[in-house]
């Protein structure tokens, strides 16, 4: 609970500082009835209250857009020892990382032509950010803070960092021609075995799959019956498989491209270190309209117990989080279509992605 309290105090201090600076630069004056009747819109800041599953929630919504270029040397959330059976979620720990979320050189946004006089900042865009508190009565009937989260209505842009561990939901989409997979297979294997022949037959048919946080070596997404935490890899989960747009080949792929608990599919790696991906693009890279191209439902939370948070991408659902820290980059549904918060080309999935520039020339960050 002390960890939660520290995060909450920091968030409230930051919010108070922003409000004070805003009020100091604005002149307040009364409006007469005529002026009021000409005004339409909603408040910049509003509060929502919700009760669910024995929890009470208060959410402070900040209506508006933000553009960020941010660099943080070390981001650590949920930095505590996960030992003992008092917290059942400890049974899901799959690495020796010291924090639930551990990212070095964390950055939002990028800089194009960073080393030239024509350097251009391409910010990370956020719409309708919010801070939310969850409350619950303890055994003595005292109302306590159970958790706090920071989230966004929409988000779009480059996220960079050396990701050592993640806890939560990280769902993405990889796709690319089978010929890319065949080329990689030939570079990493001698001869042409059954997998090689199958990929050759597939030709340029598109392969695609969902990827998520997985346990290294097996691709499991649970351990001892609970969701994994402190994951160091992302990939095709144990039991999932690659699909293809070719109907005939898709019927054969379950025999060829299913991840069977060894982090391989069609002889190719199906689980990848998070450290391989120095930058990912959140949202739709091809749609620059934040209202339609921004990813929904993203949040970071810290809680002293397992807290269900409302999924703002689908308010009829709640996302179960473990005690500790949690990052939510989950897919959501728009009509009949699944939308993933990020997509990676098959070529990059196999080889990793380079970091985009996040500083301007010699000026530093």
For the regions a language model picked out, list residue spans one by one.
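Long, compositionally biased low-complexity segments
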Residues: 51-365
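Low-complexity repetitive segments in secreted/extracellular proteins
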Residues: 1-51
């Amino acid at each position: 609970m002390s960890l939660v309290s520290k995060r909450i105090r920091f968030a409230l201090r930051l919010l108070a500082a922003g409000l004070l600076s805003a009020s100091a630069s604005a002149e307040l004056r009364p409006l007469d009835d005529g002026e009021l009747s000409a005004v339409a819109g909603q408040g910049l800041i509003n509060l929502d209250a919700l009760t669910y599953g024995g929890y009470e929630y208060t959410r402070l919504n900040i209506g508006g857009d933000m553009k960020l270029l941010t660099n943080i040397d070390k981001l650590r959330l949920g930095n505590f020892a996960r030992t003992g059976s008092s917290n059942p979620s400890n049974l899901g720990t799959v690495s020796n990382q010291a924090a639930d979320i551990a990212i070095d050189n964390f950055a939002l946004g990028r800089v194009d032509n960073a080393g030239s006089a024509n350097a251009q900042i391409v910010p990370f865009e956020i719409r309708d950010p919010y801070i939310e508190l969850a409350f619950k009565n303890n055994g003595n009937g005292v109302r306590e803070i159970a958790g706090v989260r920071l989230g966004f209505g929409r988000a779009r842009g480059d996220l960079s960092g050396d990701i050592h561990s993640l806890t939560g939901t990280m769902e993405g989409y990889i796709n690319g021609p089978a010929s890319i997979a065949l080329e990689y297979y030939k570079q990493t294997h001698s001869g042409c075995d059954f997998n090689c022949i199958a990929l050759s037959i597939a030709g340029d048919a598109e392969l695609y799959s969902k990827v998520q946080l997985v346990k290294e070596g097996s691709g499991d997404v649970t351990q001892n019956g609970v969701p994994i935490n402190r994951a160091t890899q992302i990939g095709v989960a144990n039991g999932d498989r690659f699909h293809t747009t070719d109907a005939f080949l898709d019927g054969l792929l379950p025999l060829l491209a299913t991840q069977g608990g060894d982090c391989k599919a069609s002889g190719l790696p199906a689980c990848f270190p998070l450290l391989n991906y120095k930058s990912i693009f959140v949202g739709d890279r091809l749609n620059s309209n934040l209202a339609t191209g921004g990813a929904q439902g993203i949040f970071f939370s810290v809680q002293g117990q397992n807290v269900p948070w409302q999924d703002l991408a689908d308010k009829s659902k709640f996302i179960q989080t473990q005690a500790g820290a949690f990052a939510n980059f989950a897919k959501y549904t728009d009509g009949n279509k699944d939308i993933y918060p990020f997509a990676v080309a098959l070529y990059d999935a196999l080889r990793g992605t380079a970091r985009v520039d996040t500083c301007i020339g010699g000026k530093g960050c």
